[in-house]
From Swiss-Prot:
The lineage of its organism: Eukaryota, Metazoa, Chordata, Craniata, Vertebrata. Mn(2+) 2 binds at D60, N128, H217, H245. Residues 651-677 have a biased composition (Polar residues). GO terms for biological process: DNA damage response; DNA strand resection involved in replication fork processing; double-strand break repair via homologous recombination; double-strand break repair via nonhomologous end joining; meiotic DNA double-strand break formation; mitochondrial double-strand break repair via homologous recombination; mitotic G2 DNA damage checkpoint signaling; mitotic intra-S DNA damage checkpoint signaling. The active site is at H129. It comes from the Eukaryota. Belongs to the MRE11/RAD32 family. This is Double-strand break repair protein MRE11.
Amino acid sequence: MSAVSLQDDEDTFKILIATDIHLGYLEKDAVRGNDTFVTFNEILEHAQKNEVDFILLGGDLFHENKPSRKTIHTCLESLRKYCMGDRPVSFEVLSDQAVNFQLSKFPWVNYQDENLNIFMPIFSIHGNHDDPTGVDALCALDILSCAGLLNHFGRSTSVEKIDISPILLRKGRTKIALYGLGAIPDERLYRMFVNKQVTMLRPKEDEDSWFNMFVIHQNRSKHGATNYIPEQFLDDFINLAVWGHEHECKITPAQNEQQHFYVTQPGSSVVTSLSPGEAVKKHIGLLRVKGKKMKMQRIALETVRTFYMEDVVLADHPELFNPDNPKVTQAIQAFCMEKVEMMLDNAERERLGNPRQPQKPLIILRVDYTGGFEPFIVHRFSQKYMDRVANPKDIIHFFRHREQKEKNDNDINFGKLLSRPASEEVTLRVEDLVKQYFQTAEKKVQLSLLTERRMGEAVQEFVDKEEKDAIEELVKFQLEKTQRFLKERHIDAEEEKIDEEVRKFRESRRKNTEEEDEEVREAMTRARAHRSEGVVLDSASSDEGLMDTGMKASGDSDDDIPTTLSRGRGRGRARGARGQNSAARGSSRRGRGNTSQGSSTSSRTYKSVPDKNSSIMDAFRSLKPEPSQSTSKFFSEDIIDDEMDLEESPISLSSKTNQRSSAMSSFSKRGSQSQMSRGVDFESDEDDPFKNTATSRRKK
């Protein structure tokens, strides 16, 4: 293949690759609050400057599952600024977009929308931070997709089987099959791969003429028996896998020796954890693809905050530190101060060479005090650097080295694991564990209202969809249903009779599985509705500031006043109270502190708040409990791969294929482990099709 220049690009795809941008991370921090937004703008600037065909993101565009209004607004602002314009898009989509974007209300790529003017489309899968949740299975990326600023692909709604249909792209004579799979809990996806429940669909015609890219967002390094996805699980016809979720930058593609495809790990564009993997220089990649040849150009990010980390083992300096010396703590503190100053000097020299870099660096000194040493007070030490570092509270980290037992882990034969017969499938699921537990549990802890199936589905909602109110709402829903059943039957308020009727009711419900499923769906819908209602009520309460509290003061009248809960009308009701006479305003027995105007413990009457743990007996002596409006957040933590690989080398792939330009939208399922002519290798500089390409490399 002849060498091409930047002006001869009609057959060459230019793709900007990035992942784990984590917009909104520490957005309330006075120093680091804007770091993610600044770096995101830099990434878009590089894409615009290099006139890429499209941007490919590997997940975790947002740090929070429900980003703040500031984060959403800033993201939309950047996308409108850099992605909209009059420049024509030079590639076309050949696949059936109704299949690629089947979960979208606008099932087509955004640049083909006649109402939009997109010149630089973005394709992105979701990560574990911004994954779809709730009854409607929506995420923040769906907001951007609905606005026409991003193409969200790689979604899977089934927990039983996943069919990955590629987006087929063509530019000139180069054809790319873009596969994507959004974040799925690693244990579940591992099980699905083993059970052969994941299938990658391929075009029926000229399947060897496509450059196959796969974007994935999972654990790449092993963190447990099944808490990661081995590279050997991926199909061997893939040419390049873009691996998100791992934050260490290993963007130079590395070849898998068994599957023979290449894997690039761009890493995060912002430091989210003070670990060694995050200290590696941050890069994004400019990928060029022509035919089945590729070349990755690394672009160093200039706006990333400098991060220096160093380890100190006190036991390695016996000439300086003696644990029996009464002044050893002062000596350790002086030694640590010297180390921190050295790192600050290095950070300042690096910043002077790059004016776009933030002024305050991230500094962390990890001190191993094994050997009888005692740590000093970190808080006092940190105060000396409040104005010089971005993380003053985390400068010093003391730890003790623990000798780990050597694990005799034999290498796993993944080929044998994937070729297991169906009779040996791994069928362990959360809902099955719940059912097994309650069926074998002692009588005193067995379920009396819910069936094992219902509880298992509630736990599945809690685990898989992060629906924090799932279990609570299902229990409440079934409690209310049982109470209504008992009231309708006019059962005497005797515990034995009630228990017997509850048992009969439970058995009748267990036999009707369809009605059980409907009740679970109704309870989950109500959980979402109650959570939304709670947000509205909380907002109204903060705006009005005078909502009734429903609490009875302990020092009020000793008279037997029925305490009933009634929601006030906020500010309007408080103003009405001002119109009363002065005697009414000062009638509280406790004086000024308890006036109706200034205290929440006034002499109003309130309904009692039912106990959350209400029993069946409450059906006969209390009102129906009100739904919970509690909300909770879920925080995920990324595990960083600490291996470092900053080597840079151009890569090219070659294959003897026939180029065909016919459009295709049908696919055929192919075995993932079939042996075929790969046609993927490293080429020498003499054969590099981009040898004469004028590329501007950024200074590291």
